[in-house]
Regions:
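Flexible glycine-/small-residue-rich
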Residues: 11, 45-49, 129-132, 158, ...
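Short hydrophobic/aromatic beta-strand immediately N-terminal to the Walker A/P-loop
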Residues: 125-127
Length: 322
């Protein structure tokens, strides 16, 4: 018989964590490991019942996990320095990784305050920029779904009317929500849309694919920002080459874009390259997209979410290798 896989639980108090264990795994659950991290209590547990349907996959060490996920030597060195400074070196891999990413994220600029943006008296506009194939159109639709789930009906517009493919795709994605897509062909159209948009509205603007090595396209971003008076988000595709990703981030920086999101996290086992490039820059990682379906809305880039994705991707690659 194979041992049950371990499950991780974390909370403010031991009682809270044990309640989660009992609720999830039942009264026969067995505590495997326990400890404290960043003021929280954590435990790993197994269900206590044998299950031969799933092989036990041991949790890799944090160093192994970061290396397998493609993180740069700089990040590996930083982690080793961080880990050696911790008193409890035998802590669970997941807990140590979460603490490490919390430390990294705390060193980044503050995340965008969406609630404050919604409270503004003027319309709030957001637009996604990036090269062709980065997921701008699908992510725009995902944000529309996310806002609707919060009880906010967004206004969705598209500047991608020359190639028309992006516009048709966005219209098809939002048709099920009975949400129309405004077409914008010029900067004047952006001004007109915002002029007739009520205060407290949320405007999402899809943009055409850019040549990220063309100064003219950097100017286009500045023009969009000036007219939309909004916040641009750069999109990075997970799994790309580290050097190329760093060059794209340089393009964003030169275009005064400081907030980025990562897409296609579900399609790669190499999250380390894009995350290394972001964490080595002044960029703020705002969200992660781990599903091609618009119903699966963007995930806020919390430390535990990043670690869950890393664990999932490495375990998947090991299963295929076996």
């Amino acid at each position: 018989m194979q041992q049950q896989p371990t499950h991780f639980f974390e909370g403010k108090t031991l009682k809270e964590v044990l309640d989660h264990v009992t609720h999830s795994l039942g009264e026969e659950a067995v505590i495997w490991e326990s400890g404290e991290s960043e003021g929280n209590v954590w435990v790993t547990a197994i269900s206590g019942q044998e299950d031969s349907s799933q092989p036990h996959i041991p949790l890799p060490s944090p160093e192994e996990l970061l290396e397998e996920a493609g993180f740069s030597p700089e990040i590996l060195t930083n982690f080793c320095s961080f880990a050696s400074s911790r008193r409890k070196k035998s802590a669970d891999s997941r807990a140590r990784l979460i603490a490490f990413f919390k430390k990294i994220l705390a060193q980044r600029p503050s995340s965008f305050d969406f609630d404050a943006a919604l409270a503004q008296e003027a319309p709030t506009s957001f637009f996604l920029v990036g090269a062709t194939g980065q997921g701008k159109t699908v992510t725009t639709a995902k944000f529309a779904v996310s806002l609707i789930q919060q009880g906010i009906l967004p206004i969705v517009a598209s500047l991608d009317v020359i190639k028309s493919g992006g516009l048709f795709q966005l219209e098809a994605l939002l048709q099920t929500l009975d949400l129309p897509v405004q077409t914008l062909q010029t900067q004047k159209d952006i001004r007109s849309l915002l002029a007739k948009t009520p205060s407290h509205a949320f405007v999402l603007i899809d943009t055409p694919g850019l040549n990220l090595f063309d100064a003219a396209d950097r100017r286009r971003i500045q023009e969009w920002r000036a007219e939309a008076q909004g916040t641009p988000f750069g999109l990075l595709r997970a799994g790309g080459d580290l050097r190329e990703t760093e060059e794209i981030i340089d393009f964003f920086r030169e275009a005064d874009i400081t907030r980025v999101g990562v897409t296609h996290c579900d399609a790669t086992q190499r999250l380390g390259t894009v995350l290394s490039a972001i964490f080595s820059s002044p960029m703020t990682l705002e969200f992660l997209c781990d599903s091609p379906f618009i119903s699966q809305t963007p995930q806020t880039a919390f430390a535990d979410k990043i670690v869950d994705m890393l664990l999932s991707s490495v375990k998947s690659s090991r299963k295929r290798a076996a």
